[in-house]
Curated annotation (Swiss-Prot):
UniProt name for this protein: Isoleucine--tRNA ligase
Source species of the chain: Rickettsia canadensis (strain McKiel)
GO cellular component terms, semicolon-separated: cytoplasm
The EC number(s) this enzyme carries: 6.1.1.5
Entry-linked CDD domains: Anticodon_Ia_Ile_ABEc, IleRS_core
Higher taxonomy: Bacteria, Pseudomonadati, Pseudomonadota, Alphaproteobacteria, Rickettsiales
Intervals of motif 'HIGH' region: 53-63
Cell location: Cytoplasm
Gene Ontology BP term (one): isoleucyl-tRNA aminoacylation
Gene expressing this chain: ileS
InterPro entries reported for this sequence: aa-tRNA-synth_I_CS, aa-tRNA-synth_Ia, Anticodon_Ile_ABEc, Ile-tRNA-ligase, Ile-tRNA-ligase_type2, M/V/L/I-tRNA-synth_anticd-bd, Rossmann-like_a/b/a_fold, tRNAsynth_Ia_anticodon-bd
Similarity comment text for this entry: Belongs to the class-I aminoacyl-tRNA synthetase family. IleS type 2 subfamily.
Enzyme class: ligase
Cofactor(s) named in the record: Zn(2+)
Pfam families for the chain: Anticodon_1 (PF08264), DUF5915 (PF19302), tRNA-synt_1 (PF00133)
Catalytic activity: tRNA(Ile) + L-isoleucine + ATP = L-isoleucyl-tRNA(Ile) + AMP + diphosphate
Length: 1079
């Protein structure tokens, strides 16, 4: 008679990567992703915005991390009944694309691009930005992330760009845009200004050594009431290259300045800085100087260092202001309004127009003939030499400071006056701060700290770039200043109406060719021409919510229903990037926050804390890890770590962390599934989802199941994958190491009675329910388990040679409410509804008692380990000292069997066995009560404290729960003791071994030896075997005494004179023992 097998014969050492590949194929062949969306009603949607990546490079670990998080919540909300569209997007414009194209074309700089042809350059950019889309799809698909690539949006699409134009015009009409020549962070390598927030991206500030120089300026005016032949004032700067453009000096009104005489010259320097220049000024240290306030220097004229701008109006005067800091440098700041924000503000207020003798590539112009064509940083030495020759130099020093670098080229930025269009963020930043309070940030401190403080200090946003590949600013100006006019366009229709041509491409140079006569010029000679600038690509990504829908030109209702997003996620630096630009534009255009929940994850570094990079070769290719361990393992490694809480994750190159996840998280899940299929197939029994068993272990594990399912749901509702993974792991720990182990006899027995069926049903219910509950967290392994439980053949899984394969013709057993409930037909776990288990009530009293039983067992193991007593060695007794022993007596036999003792002694006089000690959290208490620590420590040692259920009083202070811990400490004369985690109980194992106990322990070791030999001999779990045990006389006596026990536990019979299939030999208690097996 053939043995009917209803489940796959899965291996305990499964190739999870191979299983995942089969799952991916099954999903694709059956269009499961689309089914998961179509199954859900449109009225219940979960709105998710997918931040667009650049496709001109391969995905890295950071992309995968973000993708895993996105996928978890999209899958989870789907099984919660929501419709979750996952439209992918591509960021196409901006510096990344331009820099790559310049490199590939072998050209560099604006002039070279113009000579090459803007049209050809942009055409190359268009192709390059989609270079790696195939690889992106491969990575994203392999990581089991479901996204809609077919309907992806691209920021270079005409419809997307048109919505960006609309947003610009809306801001213009609201009076929230202006054009100005202002000092901005400037990338001379990219020949473009950057926004202030771009200088904070990707740790763009880094340590840099610069030459700081102190120079003297000769005053043209003398100080009143002071007679010296000559007056000089010292200024200190870390940017010597800005000195040729100096137009003013700034001092602090209330700062004290010393008049330091030397050889008929009076030197002026902040009094607090005199000692720093004692050597240069040849001071002894005991001199007394005349002190004046900075306000007394106001308006004094000085002679310029160089003659380049000596006739510049209103210049070369000393001004008092409030931004000069005492102790910095000399207390005197040189002002070059073309290269400093404060400089520009001060000089403008004094009627000094800025000068900017540096071109777009960071080189001096002909206005500085001595330095023309020289890069500014390369000019420092020449400037210092000239200052020495002129007698203006006092000191040069190396100055190490954090300095902003270009986030694309890694070159040091300069600050330079450039014309740009700005969003008046300062006009409505208070409203942004208000709307930020409506957002749930994860981690929570981002709301008011990282992001909140950034918003409070927000500046106006420069949104124009003098580049080529981007959405052009829709601004046309008259080319004749006699007849000024500005036209701003917000749609293609408006452009076509005014210019009378069909517009099919909004990119340069095509858009630049649109010209028309200036309507405000009666001569008809001037022309309206578009300004050359394109948008900052961050403006485009910040426009993603409406631009992806081509709002407001179409899909108006769709956008209104899909704004704001329920959820977005990126790494924490996007608080200065995408999150910020979304917030600015959403507030300005719609007066609403753009998203309601936002996860800011941390960064992934190597084990030494360095960034992952090809140059350092410090990370493994993710595809290699996927092929070796599977992507579920990498998903769990990342999302169960603190990186989801905004912290760093250090990952090794060799994949050990991922392997450990496979071993410690996935294998226990698979082991439970393997156990079920192995024994169910051996018994030709099917499990079903059934919660009606009255067996106490079944009730307990089903109660733990419902609790775990509820906690996973709560964790994911709170956007906490770390907690959710912990719940999954904790449940399978109990399922494997308690329920299955304590129920083995029910699965092993030959009778196919109701108790055995209940055991199978209970284990089936746990596996099926958890497969659904954890499907977003472990999507492919959950799928394999679910499909296996529902008789779906996965080709990679071997069903064996003998017996029948799972019968697809068998009727599907319908589970109780809440497990399935949408159109599924068992095609996929991802088409199910999240389990509610509403027809099953948790037995909380049983759970509490059984959890105590588990604590007793685990503490007993702890004692055995500490005392070096093996688990198979029986002990005489355990003493349980507790106030709550009554409930344990129902489980006395279970406890004795589990911890291998002959008797349990119950006591309640805890005070005779242990004392409660107070353990303080010194780091935390030290921060809160630094001046009381000595007193508190002394009182804790004397026992001068009082504890209640929720607090502890000591030295007049009430300690918080996290600031202390109460520890139950056994008296020193008591051996073999351990306390419960809650300090409510104490256990004491009797460690004295009698000869009888030792013999029984040896018998148990022999059983273990035979069971291992069965595995090594490839015996199936149902095979009965013949064994012969050859040993020395002492062991033979023990074997004779415990023979029946040995045979029962190992499904064996003793025999002699047979030809063995397997032979092995070990040493036991210093005696050799040989085992022969015949199947």
């Amino acid at each position: 008679m053939t043995n009917t097998k209803y489940y796959p014969e899965v291996s305990s050492n499964a190739d999870f990567a191979a299983i995942e590949r089969e799952i991916l194929k099954l999903w694709q062949d059956n269009n499961i992703f689309q089914k998961s969306i179509d199954n859900r009603i449109k009225d219940a949607e979960f709105i998710f915005y997918d931040g667009p990546p650049f496709a001109n490079g391969l995905p890295h670990y950071g992309h995968l991390l973000t993708g895993f998080i996105k996928d978890v919540y999209a899958r989870y909300q789907t099984i919660k009944g929501k419709k979750v569209e996952r439209r992918f997007g591509w960021d196409c414009h901006g510096l990344p694309a331009e820099m790559q194209s310049e490199q590939e074309l072998g050209i560099s700089g604006r002039l070279a691009i113009t000579n090459f042809s803007i049209e050809k350059f942009n055409s190359h950019c268009r192709a390059s930005v989609m270079k790696y889309t195939g690889e992106w799809e491969q990575y994203v698909t392999r990581q089991a992330r479901w996204v809609d690539f077919k309907n992806s949006y691209k920021t270079m699409d005409t419809h997307f760009m048109e919505s960006v134009l609309w947003a610009f015009k809306e801001l213009y009409n609201k009076g929230l845009l202006y054009e100005s020549m202002r000092v901005m962070p400037y990338s001379w390598a990219c020949e473009t200004p950057l926004s202030h927030f771009e200088t904070r991206l990707d740790n763009s500030y880094r340590e840099r050594a610069d030459k700081a120089v102190t120079v003297s300026f000769m005053l043209r005016d003398k100080l009143p009431h002071s007679e010296y032949k000559e007056y000089r004032i010292f200024a200190w700067t870390t940017t010597p290259w800005t000195l040729p453009a100096n137009l003013a000096l700034a001092v602090g009104s209330d700062i004290d300045y010393a008049l330091v005489p030397k050889n008929d010259i009076c030197y002026i320097i902040a009094a607090a800085s005199v000692s720093k220049y004692a050597k240069e000024l040849e001071l002894k240290g005991d001199e007394q100087f005349t002190i004046i306030k900075g306000s007394e220097l106001e308006g004094l004229r000085y002679k310029p260092l160089f003659n380049y701008f000596e006739n510049h109006p209103n210049s070369f005067k000393i001004f008092a202001c409030d931004f000069v800091v005492e102790g910095d440098g000399t207390g005197v700041v040189h002002m070059a309004p073309g290269f400093g924000e404060d400089d520009q503000i001060l000089c403008e207020s004094k009627g000094i127009e800025l000068v900017c003798p540096v071109d777009n590539s960071g080189k001096f112009t002909k206005e500085i003939p001595d330095l023309e064509g020289l890069q500014v940083f390369d000019a420092n030495d020449k400037i210092i030499i000239k200052l020495k020759e002129q007698g203006n130099w006092l000191k040069t020093e190396q100055y190490i400071h954090n300095y902003p670098h270009c986030w694309r080229t890694d070159t040091p930025l300069i600050y330079k006056a450039v014309p740009s269009w700005y969003v008046k963020v300062t006009n409505f930043k208070d409203r942004i701060v208000e709307l930020n309070q409506q957002i749930n940030w994860i981690p929570s401190h981002v709301k008011d700290n990282v992001f909140g403080k950034w918003l409070e200090n927000a500046r106006d946003w420069s949104i124009s770039r003098n580049r080529f590949w981007g959405t052009p600013l829709p601004v046309w100006k008259s080319d004749d200043p006699k007849y000024p006019r500005i036209d701003v366009y917000g749609s293609i229709e408006e452009l076509e109406k005014d210019f009378g041509v069909k517009v099919t491409d909004l990119h340069r140079p095509f858009i630049d060719e649109l010209t028309r006569a200036n309507p405000d010029d009666p001569t008809g000679k001037s022309t309206m021409r578009r300004i050359e600038d394109v948008f900052d690509c961050w403006f485009e990504s910040g426009s993603m919510p409406y631009s992806q829908a081509h709002y407001p030109f179409e899909n108006k209702k769709w956008f209104e229903d899909h704004f704001p997003a329920d959820f977005i996620v990126e790494y924490v630096a996007q608080t200065r990037g995408w999150f910020y630009t979304l917030m600015v534009l959403s507030t300005a255009l719609f007066d609403r926050p753009p998203f309601l929940n936002c996860i800011c994850h941390g960064v992934i570094l190597d084990t030494t804390g360095q960034k992952l990079s090809k140059r350092l070769n410090n990370y493994a290719d993710p595809l290699e890890l996927f092929d070796k361990y599977g992507s579920d393992a990498l998903r769990i490694t990342m999302l169960s770590s603190n990186v989801v809480k905004g912290q760093e994750l250090l990952i090794d190159k060799d994949g050990k962390m991922v392997f450990d996840t496979l071993r410690l998280f996935i294998k226990p899940i698979w082991n439970a599934y393997h156990f079920f299929t192995m024994y169910a197939n051996a018994d030709s029994l099917k499990g079903k989802s059934d919660f009606a068993s009255e067996n106490v272990l079944d009730i307990y594990i089903l109660s733990k199941l419902k609790i775990a399912v509820q906690k996973i749901e709560k964790s994911l509702d709170n956007f906490d994958t770390q907690a959710a993974y912990h719940q999954v792991s904790e449940f399978f720990e109990v399922l494997n190491n308690w329920y299955i182990r304590r129920s083995r006899a029910r699965f092993w027995k030959s009778e196919k009675d109701a108790d055995k069926q209940n055991a199978y049903n209970t284990l089936y219910s746990c596996l099926e329910t958890m497969a659904i509950a954890m499907s977003a967290l472990v999507p492919m392994i959950s799928e394999a388990i679910y499909l296996g439980l529902h008789n779906t053949v996965i080709p990679q899984l071997d069903y064996g040679i003998s017996g029948d394969k799972p019968g697809a013709q068998d009727p599907i057993i319908k589970s109780q409410d809440g497990i399935r409930g949408c159109r599924n037909d068992n095609l996929s776990v991802h088409l199910c509804n999240y389990p509610k288990l509403s027809n099953f009530e948790v037995n909380h009293e049983l759970v509490a008692t059984m959890d105590t039983v588990l604590d007793i067992c685990s503490n007993s193991l702890f004692i055995r380990s500490n005392e070096n007593v093996r688990v198979r060695q029986p002990l005489a007794s355990i003493t349980i000292i507790s106030k709550h022993n009554d409930k344990l007596k129902d489980f006395e036999d279970l406890i004795k069997d589990e911890i291998n003792v002959k008797a349990i002694i119950y006591r309640d006089d805890l005070e005779n066995y242990a004392t409660t000690k107070l353990s303080l959290n010194f780091p935390m208490l030290g921060k809160r009560l630094p001046y009381k620590m000595k007193e508190i420590i002394a009182a804790s040692k004397k026992g001068e404290w009082e504890a209640t259920a929720s607090a502890l009083a000591i030295c007049g202070e009430t300690l918080k729960s996290e600031e202390y811990k109460l520890v139950l400490e056994p008296y020193s004369h008591i051996k073999g003791a351990a306390s419960f985690a809650d300090n409510s109980s104490l256990l004491i194992l009797d460690l004295e071994l009698t000869p009888e106990l030792i013999k029984e322990g040896i018998a148990r070791d022999i059983v273990r030896f035979i069971q291992q030999a069965r595995k090594d001999a490839d015996c199936s779990i149902t095979d009965r075997i013949l064994i012969e045990i050859i040993s020395e006389s002492d062991l033979s006596k023990i074997i004779n005494i415990y023979g029946d026990y040995i045979k029962e536990q190992t499904l064996s019979e003793f025999a002699k004179d047979f030809t063995p299939d397997y032979v092995n030999e070990i040493e036991l208690e210093n005696h050799k023992i040989q085992l022969k097996i015949k199947r």
